[in-house]
Swiss-Prot record:
Classification of source organism: Eukaryota, Amoebozoa, Evosea, Eumycetozoa, Dictyostelia
Signal sequence segment: none
Protein name: HssA/B-like protein 12
Source species of the chain: Dictyostelium discoideum (Social amoeba)
Sequence similarity: Belongs to the hssA/B family.
Any single GO BP term: sorocarp development
Domain of life: Eukaryota
């Protein structure tokens, strides 16, 4: 096998791996959003920014998951605001 062929095969493995990671992310996000009620407290602007960034990344890769932004907002809100806020 030539060096060029081995490099191209490594590139193929990486692209397959990335595809699997995104599909598992969307599946776990959908499952967690169906079973966990999340709500942030305090209204920190950082929470909305993180949610919007994650939503933009998912839409940019072709995976559209509408519930991910709300779930991320709740989780991050719980982490930033204290033990009484977040997912229940």
């Amino acid at each position: 096998m030539t060096l060029l062929a081995s490099i191209s095969s490594i590139g193929n493995v990486k692209s397959i791996s990335k595809s699997n990671n995104f599909s598992s992310l969307s599946n776990s996000s959908l499952q967690s959003s169906n079973s966990i009620q999340c709500g942030g407290c305090g209204g920190s602007p950082l929470i909305g920014t993180v949610g919007n960034l994650v939503g933009g990344v998912l839409v940019g890769t072709g995976i559209i998951v509408g519930t991910v932004v709300g779930t991320v907002n709740g989780v991050v809100g719980g982490l930033l605001s204290g033990p009484n806020c977040g997912c229940h």
